[in-house]
Design a protein with these regions (language model features):
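Charged docking surfaces used in two-component/phosphorelay signaling
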Residues: 15-19, 23
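Short hydrophobic/Thr-rich beta-strand motif most characteristic of the beta2 strand and flanking loop
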Residues: 25-32, 40
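Acidic catalytic/metal-coordinating carboxylates
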Residues: 33-36, 59-62
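Active-site beta3 strand of CheY-like receiver
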Residues: 44-50
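Receiver (REC) domain active-site loop signature in two-component systems and cognate sites
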Residues: 55
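Alpha4 helix (beta4-alpha4-beta5 surface) of REC/receiver domains from two-component response regulators
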Residues: 62, 83-98
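C-terminal output helix
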Residues: 86, 104-113
Length: 119
């Protein structure tokens, strides 16, 4: 079963992504912040991570850096607010596979995540 870790401090986005990917047959883990995300990965390595960049506490870029040090094989797709170009560039240089700007097209995100499992 394909597994996905969804990390976003906005509950509505977590629930939307959860619903879409459960329908696709994914095993979903949800995290509301960076620390929860890292703890979830330590418990069970996901097949892919959808990671918000702007979160209180441990932000997405720091989570991405830690993921790439500890689990470089996990593909990470980032989600960022419009206008955060520098942060997006930093994330791609750090190892993110792809990015989406909020508000994003849910079907494009779905297709990108599915593509991570085909490669």
């Amino acid at each position: 079963m394909k597994s996905l870790l969804i990390v976003d401090d906005q509950k509505g986005i977590r629930l939307l992504l959860d619903e879409v990917f459960r329908r696709e047959g994914f095993k979903i883990t949800l995290a509301a912040n960076g620390m929860e995300a890292l703890q979830a990965v330590e418990r069970e390595i996901p097949g892919c991570v959808l990671l918000d960049m702007k979160m209180p506490g441990l932000d997405g870029l720091e989570v991405l850096k830690r993921l790439k040090i500890g689990w470089p094989e996990i593909p990470v797709i980032i989600m960022t607010a419009y206008g955060e170009i520098e942060l997006t560039e930093d994330a791609l240089e750090t190892g993110a596979m792809k990015y989406f700007t909020k508000p994003f097209d849910i079907y494009e995100v779905r297709d990108a995540v599915n593509a991570m499992f085909e490669n």
